[in-house]
Amino acid sequence: MDSGRQNKVPITRLSKFFDDEDFGLEIDFGREYVEGDLNMTVVLYSINIEKTDTDDVYKEVKSQDMRFFPPVELKVNLEIDASENSTYGPGGRLRYRDYGDMTFNIYDKQLKEKGTDIKYGDFIGYMVDEDTMKFWVVVDDGKIFSDNEHTIFGYKGATRTVKCTVADKNEFEGI
């Protein structure tokens, strides 16, 4: 068998009552709800790894040396966790409060149609009000989505769950 060739194997599970046409219909219904009814938009700032300057020794990147692909708007179903009152040190004198973590679901088909992907370290922007865009950094890109929660009736993966944590202002403030 040629190792450079990929064989496609048809999905035949559930074939008595569910097939690829039904799967496509379910995707269309779900996308209509997420992209039409909910209409929650995030902006993906995807890092262009090839054009980003890295340190020769440690392969670290300074924020000013990061290069990005053009921003892409994505329609998602998102949730932002409640913020927490935290301290910088054990004494509790220096306190701060920031937004909570963000988790969102996105249809994989939308990413393919837009010719983009979400990966670890990318930044996500979200308008929290009319004047403020807040940024999060991707900590789980959700690329493995074959579990029951992310499939439609266990047939095939449909949605990805992406987890993000608040980006520090020194790390990213938009482009």
State where each predicted segment sits.
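Intrinsically disordered, low-complexity terminal/linker regions enriched in Pro/Ser/Gly
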Residues: 171-175
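Short coil-to-beta transition motif at edge beta-strands of beta-rich domains
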Residues: 42, 112-129
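Core residues of folded domains in eukaryotic genome-function proteins
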Residues: 100-102, 120-122, 132-134, 158-160
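Short alpha-helix capping/helix-loop boundary micro-motifs
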Residues: 100-116
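Short beta-strand/loop turn elements enriched in aromatics
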Residues: 59-105
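Active-site-proximal polar cores
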Residues: 1-77
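Short, solvent-exposed secondary-structure boundary/capping segments
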Residues: 87-88, 103, 142-165
